Design a protein with these regions (language model features):
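A short, glycine-/small-residue-rich helix N-cap motif at loop->alpha-helix starts
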Residues: 85-92
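A conserved acidic beta->alpha catalytic loop
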Residues: 58-67
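Conserved catalytic core of nucleotide-sugar-dependent glycosyltransferases
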Residues: 97-98, 108, 112-196, 200, ...
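Short, acidic, metal-binding catalytic loop of nucleotide-sugar glycosyltransferases
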Residues: 41-53
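Active-site nucleotide-sugar/metal-binding loop of Leloir-type enzymes
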Residues: 94-104
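C-terminal catalytic/acceptor-binding lobe
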Residues: 1-10, 16-24, 30, 36-43, ...
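Short internal beta-strands
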Residues: 54-59, 135
C-alpha cells in the first residue's frame, strides 16, 4: 500500500476536539434542477438531531442559487452552506469541503426524504461501525461463469449462496460514512475519476470499492428504514433522476468490470446483516424494492 493510499484516521478523536464535531454529522446534498424540492428537504432536515451543518453542492451551473431566499426566511437552527460548482459532475459531492468539520458525513440525494428517527438510529449505528458505509439502500454484484460481473438489486440471486439475501454495497445517496474517505477518494487513480465523469455515474460504487479495499471487510452496513421516501414526482422541474435512464443498470455493470480491471481485484464482500430498530442485528430475507 502506498503512502498516499493509507487508510484515513478513523479512530475516535481526543476530548480536546469540539464535542459538537464528534457527536454530530454534516449533511452533504448535491442538487441539480430541483430548487423547489431542495427547499422542502432543507426545511425537513433542519429538525434532525445531531445535525451540525448542511453543505449544498449546487450543480445548476449558471443558475441562481436559492441562498438569498433561504436566508431571508430564517433564522434557521442549522447553518446551510451553498457550494457553487463550475461543472455538473457527479463526483462534485465527494470533494473535501473546508466547511466540513465533523467526522461523520451524511450524504443524501436531492429527491430523498429520510425520517428523523431513521437518521438518528442510523447515526448511532455508524458510531459503532465508523469505518463502513452505514445506509438504507443495499445493492450487490454477481459474477457469471465467464468472470463478468453484473450489478443488481438486493433480491438478485447470488451464485454459491443458499437461501437469504446478500448485499455487497450500500449506496451513498442515503448513508453515513467517515469524512476521511473523501480524502481517500481524491487519491484514487485518474482512471477511476475519468470513469465517473465518462458515465456521470458510479461514484457510489467507487466508494464501496475503496472502503472494502482498505478495510478488508464488507463495505457497508444495511440499516432497514422505517420511513424513507422518494419525492421526485413532487418537483415542478420535470427533471428525472439518472436512474431512470435505459442504460443506467448497464452502466453500473460496466463500471463494476472497469473498476475490477483498474484495481486488478474485486474487493467487494457479501454481507447479510440487516440492522433494524426492532431487533439488532436481524438476519432475514428482507426484500425492499427502492
Amino acid at each position: 500500500m502506498s503512502k498516499d493510499d493509507k487508510m484515513p484516521n478513523l479512530r475516535r478523536e481526543p476530548k480536546s476536539q469540539s464535542q459538537s464535531a464528534l457527536d454530530s454529522f454534516t449533511l452533504v446534498m448535491q442538487t441539480y434542477n430541483r430548487t423547489d424540492l431542495l427547499l422542502k428537504l432543507l426545511n425537513h432536515y433542519q429538525a434532525i438531531p445531531h445535525l451540525h451543518k448542511v453543505i449544498v453542492v449546487w450543480n445548476n451551473v449558471g443558475e441562481k442559487m436559492p441562498e438569498e431566499m433561504w436566508n431571508y426566511l430564517g433564522p434557521h437552527p442549522v447553518p446551510v452552506v451553498f457550494k457553487v460548482q463550475t461543472m455538473n459532475h457527479m463526483r462534485n459531492r465527494l470533494q473535501i469541503f473546508p466547511e466540513l468539520e465533523t467526522k461523520a458525513v451524511l450524504m443524501v440525494d436531492d429527491d430523498t426524504l429520510i425520517s428523523a428517527y431513521d437518521l438518528a438510529f442510523a447515526f448511532s449505528v455508524w458510531q459503532q461501525f465508523p469505518d463502513q458505509i452505514v445506509g438504507f439502500v443495499p445493492r450487490k454484484h454477481v459474477s457469471t461463469p465467464s468472470g463478468i460481473y453484473s450489478y443488481g438489486s438486493f433480491e438478485l440471486q447470488t451464485p454459491g449462496f443458499g437461501n437469504g439475501d446478500q448485499y455487497s454495497m450500500v449506496l451513498i445517496g442515503a448513508a453515513f460514512f467517515h469524512s476521511g474517505y473523501l480524502e481517500l477518494f481524491q487519491k484514487q487513480p485518474d482512471a477511476v475519476h475519468a470513469l465517473i465523469d465518462e458515465t456521470q455515474n458510479c461514484d457510489d460504487i467507487v466508494m464501496n470499492f475503496l472502503v472494502a479495499k482498505h478495510t478488508g471487510k464488507p463495505s457497508g452496513v444495511f440499516v432497514k428504514p422505517v420511513d424513507i421516501r422518494n419525492l421526485e414526482k413532487e418537483t415542478n422541474s420535470g427533471y428525472s433522476g439518472m436512474w431512470h435512464r435505459a442504460e443506467h443498470l448497464l452502466q453500473r455493470s460496466y463500471c463494476l468490470n472497469k473498476l475490477v480491471n483498474i484495481y486488478d481485484s474485486m474487493p467487494l464482500k457479501y454481507s447479510n446483516i440487516i440492522i433494524s430498530q426492532f431487533g439488532f442485528p436481524n438476519y432475514a430475507n428482507y426484500k425492499n424494492k427502492m
